[in-house]
Design a protein with these regions (language model features):
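Substrate-positioning beta->alpha
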Residues: 1-3, 16-39, 46-47
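Residues in well-ordered alpha-helical elements
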Residues: 2, 29-32, 60-61, 110, ...
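Short, hinge-like loop/turn segments at secondary-structure boundaries
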Residues: 3-7, 93-96
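A short C-terminal helix-loop "cap" of Rossmann-like NAD(P)-dependent dehydrogenase/epimerase domains
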Residues: 5-16, 72
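Short aromatic/basic micro-patch
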Residues: 25, 56, 106
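Conserved C-terminal active-site "lid" loop/helix of NAD(P)H-dependent oxidoreductases
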Residues: 28, 89-119
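Mid/C-terminal beta-alpha module of Rossmann-like enzyme folds, strongest
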Residues: 37-96, 131
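Amphipathic terminal alpha-helices
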Residues: 113-114, 121-131
């Protein structure tokens, strides 16, 4: 995400296609709230929790929010997915990067919600320093 943010800021990161991929995010303020909740609840002893904002986002959604956070206009065009797929054929390293960028990475914070957690901020609430 930091590289994407830097690339958008400098003007060299390509507009991502809308692939419908699913990614989880959480605002740092909500993450801190989740940590404090778990630290203060005896039911959490020895447990592992995942914290998300409860919404699935596409990489294009994240790209658009980053553009807004940087006060950059959102391009009306995008690099076609097949070009990313072709680039992924060049090497395993590039394939890994393309998969990380356009693949799914979604999680559930349902277990944490049973302790009473509910995210208060959304992806759109994030600004440059949150990424």
């Amino acid at each position: 995400l930091k590289l994407m943010l830097l690339g958008i800021k400098k003007g060299w990161f390509p507009p991502l296609p809308e692939t419908g991929n699913k990614r989880s995010m959480i605002h740092v303020d909500d993450l801190v709230r989740a940590i404090l909740l778990v630290a203060g609840d005896d039911r959490a002893n020895g447990e592992i929790y995942i914290a998300t904002d409860g919404t699935l986002h596409s990489s294009r959604d994240i790209y658009n929010v980053m553009c807004n956070a940087l006060d950059r206009s959102i391009p009306k065009w995008s690099v076609p997915k097949f070009l990313f797929d072709m680039a992924a054929l060049i090497s395993p390293r590039i394939k890994y990067k393309v998969d990380k960028l356009l693949g799914d990475e979604c999680y559930s914070s349902g277990k944490l919600e049973k302790l009473g957690f509910k995210a208060q901020k959304t992806l759109k609430d994030m600004n440059e320093t949150d990424f």
